[in-house]
Amino acid sequence: FAWNNLALAELRDLNRHRTGNRFTPLIQAGFYLPPEIDRAPHAALLADQLELTRALLERSSPAYVYSLLLGAQTPFEHSTHADKFIYEAELRTGLGAHFRYAGHLSAALHAFFAQVPEARDWVVEGTAEPE
């Protein structure tokens, strides 16, 4: 499964303790701010960060990754076996799951169900209700 807009903060957590292969090019493809946060007060910071990142990339500097903020979104790919994916999807959509993880894993789980419809009977998708 893959996402084209996973924030670095989420990637950092999802990348831990998981089986399979994970890949991200660490190229910024957007920036996540919660809907209730007004982007306007942060526009100058985000513009400066974008300018710095572009300048470092134009120089082919590997240091560009240090210009990425935790809200920077990047493509993320994760290949794994079905049993490990099901475990992760149930865990990340279950009780107390972070709403962003739950949204990402719910979408991936629905794509999985489209390919393996018989799995619906034995895979439990949670509702990410708070503990």
Task: Briefly describe each language-model feature range.
Residues 2-131:
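Family-specific signature for flavin-dependent thymidylate synthase
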